[in-house]
Regions:
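Nucleotide/phosphate-binding catalytic cleft detector across ATP-hydrolyzing
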Residues: 1-29, 33-151, 164-277, 284-311, ...
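C-terminal, charged low-complexity interaction regions
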Residues: 155-156
Length: 333
């Protein structure tokens, strides 16, 4: 039975690292900054360190080695993760057992990519556990009972919908929709409605500041914009103006949930109707989201606390129960 000393969640937008006995030690963007003019050493910085690179040029480009939960560039993923691991004190020649927290619907080939990447990082033992299974440990739901539970993880790059029964993923899907799509829609909205161009990063700030879909919410924010002559001014954006963008996105999430429910046997659907749907991920903290999804699907919906770290905190609890963790890994392999 492997005793894991580290867990990694390689997300589309953020990478998180958990160390046993310590907790979450890293939460940084899943990004590398490349110098396109350099062939030998194109990687200039990774994660948060990219912000420290000033005077960026057109020959520099940010890339992510992950798309929809899948590793699309193993070499860049290895470079980025080695730098992250060194940052948290994981020396190359003293790496023990690694646990990947992954999306639900990975193919066998995708799983092998994660395992092989783990070995290439120098770990002696590498295993995989669906993030949803770890997440339910944080929610302190008794997974030994025979009832099915649903977890919806709305992340930055994808949305993971999972049905878990007695610690095993029974049904699920990973859809390529996430917070980045909302950011792009905000950029388009400001361009169309106000003839104002903003960056995706600025759109993300707006989304995080005005995170409500309640119809009468007075929440809003001011956006500093610069015109073509370099003059700055403030533009006020209200929740009402953003609401259609948000509802369009969350309706797609509802469609994902419905499609997974439709794939389940009647007795599983009956369970979910009783146990409800749990929301986690970065976009789960939108005010009114639980009520919106319930109104569309007709099933109780629960927003969890600290939704961005649900699977990480659940995994931390499992690190303290190695036999249970080993059982869950085997059950979902």
């Amino acid at each position: 039975m492997a005793k894991y000393n580290i867990a990694i969640s390689l997300g589309c937008t953020n990478t998180r690292i958990l160390k046993t006995g310590v907790g979450v030690v890293l939460n940084e963007p899943t990004l590398l900054l490349l110098d396109l003019n350099s062939k030998k050493n194109p990687v200039l910085a990774v994660g948060d360190d990219i912000k420290n690179i000033h005077n960026k040029t057109t020959s520099m480009q940010c890339v992510s080695p992950v798309k929809n939960g899948n590793i699309v560039n193993k070499e860049y993923a290895k470079i980025m993760l080695n730098k992250f691991l060194e940052k948290v004190g994981e020396k190359k020649f003293f790496r023990g057992s690694l646990l990947w927290l992954t999306p639900t619907s990975l193919s066998e080939n995708d799983k092998n990519e994660y395992v092989n990447l783990g070995y290439s990082l120098g770990y002696k033992n590498v295993s995989i556990l669906p993030s949803a299974v770890a997440g339910f440990q944080e929610l302190e739901i008794d997974m030994d009972n025979r009832h099915a539970h649903m977890l919806v993880d709305i992340g930055g790059g994808c949305t993971d919908v999972s049905v878990v029964v007695r610690g095993k993923v029974l049904q699920g899907c990973t859809a390529g929709i996430g917070g980045r799509d909302v950011d792009s829609s905000i950029v388009n909205l400001l361009n169309d409605a106000f003839e104002t161009k903003i960056s995706l990063e600025k759109a993300k700030e707006i989304k995080e500041s005005v995170n409500t879909i309640l119809p009468n919410d007075q929440l809003g924010c001011n956006v500093m914009i610069v015109d073509e002559f370099g003059a700055g001014s403030e533009l006020a954006i209200s929740a009402r103006e953003l609401r259609d963008v948000y509802l369009t996105f969350f309706m797609k999430v509802c469609n994902c949930i419905t499609s997974v429910i439709n794939m389940c046997p009647n007795e599983i659907v009956a369970d979910i109707n009783k146990t409800g749907i749990y929301l986690c991920g970065g976009l789960a903290n939108f005010t009114g989201l639980d009520k919106f999804i319930r109104s569309k699907i007709g099933i109780p919906v629960y927003a969890v606390e600290r939704p961005e770290f649900t699977s990480m905190f659940g995994c931390e609890k499992l690190f303290n129960e190695p036999e249970k963790l080993s059982h869950l890994v085997t059950l979902n392999s």
